[in-house]
């Protein structure tokens, strides 16, 4: 089979002085950072959908890309051609993982029977490609939002037959993920929300999606899948308001249905932007709540109100993200999946490499900065000092529930407490972060 990316052998590390646009300047997979290989810290993945399914179309224009597998032809043969190119790309980019939705890799067909048959064939084909290339599956998922049947949601749909179709897709995609050795399974509810409350029963829809997630957990254990289940928060788009708004909202949902020990979150940077949060905030919140799982690494445009899915290029932003992740022990089953796409005007096929190479170098630099922050330990020391009072006898009695509200009030009165405010030193800490970023 003729190579699609025939002008490139493989992207390799050439160092910071390299001027080769098809080489890594900072991402060196075997470089040790805090005693661990860079590749093992970052666990990079490339996504199937933006990279091989999008044709460059937008709300105002038709597709601008010339992709051989997007031409008229027999659907399964085109899907196999797409898989051939995808795995050529994964191998040449030197990413250890990839991610997919069911209908990214397989034609949906005109019926449920066709869907199941097509997907079964493509799962076998993907298994062959994984074995040949050594590329592994970070996570799989089901697309329960694109087809018109999901206009009013999947698990939250007012029609139980639509709910049942979605259940079939999720069961099938979970089984496929398990068969392919996937390390996680993701659930993103793009249509799980509402456009108007005038025709929406919030309590009913919440009960539906809660039961759906409980059944997903039950199925995971039934088939012996050892990976992590992940919900991906997003506040809106395509739905006006989505039920998985942000990390805190997802945690509240999980607690309501007794799922907080079973499901974690896959956090996307651009979704944090849309929710009015920083990427750093969402990562830190997930870690604090004990539900951090994986990351969709990209960036949004703060001047635009939609999901632009651009490649991450900010070392400043991502250094703080990597600092939180590494400090918390790093990824287990999760990783950094590039849920990002080239721009509509980027029609050269090698633009796919330029986008990913820049993103991988960005995250490598961010990791190195995070390592300097951790090794120095100054930020941790200052935070510990700020909360040191809670290690006192009074602080520990409060936290351990040994004092009631009235008893604390009595203590304050008896000891004539008159605490004064201590500086938070925000500006000093911001300067310290800049030191790690820019002073070598």
UniProtKB/Swiss-Prot annotation:
Catalyses: alpha-D-xylose = alpha-D-xylulofuranose
Share an example GO biological-process annotation for this protein.
D-xylose metabolic process
Q: Where in the cell is it found?
A: Cytoplasm
Superkingdom of origin organism: Bacteria
Q: Where is the active site?
A: 101, 104
- Hydrolase recorded as keyword: no
Instruction: Cite the binding residues for Mg(2+) 2.
Output: 268, 271, 307, 309
User: Into which family does the record put it?
Assistant: Belongs to the xylose isomerase family.
The record describes its quaternary structure and partners as:
Homotetramer.
**SUPFAM superfamilies linked to this entry:** Xylose isomerase-like (SSF51658)
Which residues does the annotation say bind Mg(2+) 1? 232, 268, 296, 339
Enzyme class (EC, first level): isomerase
* Molecular functions (GO terms): magnesium ion binding; xylose isomerase activity
Q: Does the keyword Cytoplasm apply?
A: yes
Record's cofactor remark: Binds 2 magnesium ions per subunit.
| E.C. number(s) listed in UniProt | 5.3.1.5
Question: Could you tell me what this protein is called?
Answer: Xylose isomerase
Q: What are the entry keywords?
A: Carbohydrate metabolism, Cytoplasm, Isomerase, Magnesium, Metal-binding, Xylose metabolism
- Co-factor(s): Mg(2+)
Q: Which GO terms describe its cellular component?
A: cytoplasm
Q: Which organism is it from?
A: Enterobacter sp. (strain 638)
């Amino acid at each position: 089979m003729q190579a699609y990316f025939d002008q490139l052998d493989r992207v390799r590390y050439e160092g910071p002085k390299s001027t080769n646009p098809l080489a890594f300047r900072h991402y060196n997979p075997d470089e040790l950072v805090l005693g661990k290989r860079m590749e093992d810290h970052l666990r990079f993945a490339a996504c199937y959908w933006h990279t091989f399914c999008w044709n460059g179309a937008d709300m105002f224009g038709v597709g601008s890309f010339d992709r051989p597998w997007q031409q008229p032809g027999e659907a399964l043969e085109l899907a196999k051609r797409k898989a051939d190119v995808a795995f050529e790309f994964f191998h040449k980019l030197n990413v250890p993982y990839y991610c997919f939705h069911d209908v990214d890799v397989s034609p949906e067909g005109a019926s449920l029977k066709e869907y199941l048959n097509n997907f079964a064939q493509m799962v076998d084909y993907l298994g062959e490609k994984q074995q040949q290339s050594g590329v592994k599956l970070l996570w799989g998922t089901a697309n329960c939002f694109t087809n018109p049947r999901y206009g009013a949601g999947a698990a939250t749909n007012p029609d139980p037959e639509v709910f049942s179709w979605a259940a079939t897709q999720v069961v099938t995609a979970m089984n496929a993920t398990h068969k392919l050795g996937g390390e996680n399974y993701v659930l993103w509810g793009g249509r799980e929300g509402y456009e108007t409350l005038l025709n929406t029963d919030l309590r009913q829809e919440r009960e539906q999606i809660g039961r759906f997630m409980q059944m997903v957990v039950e199925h995971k254990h039934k088939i012996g899948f050892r990976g992590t289940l992940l919900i991906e928060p997003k506040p809106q788009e395509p739905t006006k308001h989505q039920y998985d708004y942000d990390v805190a909202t997802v945690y509240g949902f999980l607690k309501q249905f007794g799922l907080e020990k079973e499901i974690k979150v896959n956090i996307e940077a651009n979704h944090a932007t849309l929710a009015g949060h920083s990427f750093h905030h969402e990562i830190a919140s997930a870690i604090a709540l004990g539900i951090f799982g994986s990351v969709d690494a990209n960036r949004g445009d703060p001047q635009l109100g939609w999901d632009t899915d651009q490649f991450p290029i900010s070392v400043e932003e991502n250094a703080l993200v990597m600092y939180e992740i590494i400090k918390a022990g790093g990824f287990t089953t999760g990783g950094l999946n590039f849920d990002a796409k080239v721009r509509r005007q980027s029609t050269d096929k090698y633009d796919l490499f330029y986008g990913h190479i820049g993103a991988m170098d960005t995250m490598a630099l961010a990791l190195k900065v995070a390592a300097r922050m951790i090794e120095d330990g100054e930020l941790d020391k200052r935070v510990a000092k700020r909360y040191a009072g809670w290690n006192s006898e009074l602080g520990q009695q409060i936290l351990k529930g040994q004092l009631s509200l009235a008893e604390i009030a009595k203590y304050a009165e008896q000891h004539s407490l008159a605490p004064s405010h201590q500086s938070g030193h925000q500006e000093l800490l911001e300067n310290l972060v800049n030191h790690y970023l820019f002073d070598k």
